[in-house]
Amino acid sequence: MAGPRTTVEAQAFYRMYHSYADIPDPWDRMRWCRYSLGLLQKDVAAMVGMEEWLYQDLESGAFHRSFTPELADKLAALYGIPVEDILDDYTLFLHRGGGAFLRRYREAKGWNRQQLADHAKVGCTSIRTWENGQKSISHKCFDLLVENLGHDFTAMLHM
């Protein structure tokens, strides 16, 4: 679907969510913003300089590594919303620097790499390569970090 085929489709979406604040998912927030501006997916994609298929995937909840921080910032600016509103936790983590964020988290906790590795239940070598940007953190590893580090990890992510 490139856009609401009818105003009925957009109205049905608006009935599902009474206000923007009610929308829990980033992809539905993007759809809400697009509908409120009366734009098609292809229009939004062209306006921010991304491929139409990528924007369609984003509105379907399929985030990709090709959804760069720069594209996220452009999309948020177009919609006039904070970039955090359109990113899931993993994409927000990447937007905040991935390994660089992990280093900031570790330093805020007062831990060395081995202590972080112990808490996260991953190898110290993984921590080092992630922090140094030698290796990117997969979605699976991010989920492991969230599970093992707990609420304060995601809370810091949203600060």
Where are these regions (language model features)?
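Short, structured motif recognition centered on aromatic/hydrophobic residues
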Residues: 30, 55, 83, 102, ...
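Short coil turns linking two alpha-helices in DNA-binding domains
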Residues: 40, 51-54, 68, 82, ...
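Residues within the alpha-helical elements of helix-turn-helix
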Residues: 36, 47, 78, 108, ...
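Recognition helix of helix-turn-helix/homeodomain-like DNA-binding domains
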Residues: 49-66, 91, 122-136
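DNA major-groove recognition helix of helix-turn-helix/homeodomain DNA-binding modules
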Residues: 69-85, 138-156
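Short alpha-helical "recognition helix" segments of helix-turn-helix
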Residues: 41-46, 113-118
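A short, Lys/Arg-rich alpha-helix, primarily the initiator
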Residues: 3-36, 88-108
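Key DNA-contacting residues within the recognition helix of helix-turn-helix
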Residues: 31, 56-57, 87, 128-129, ...
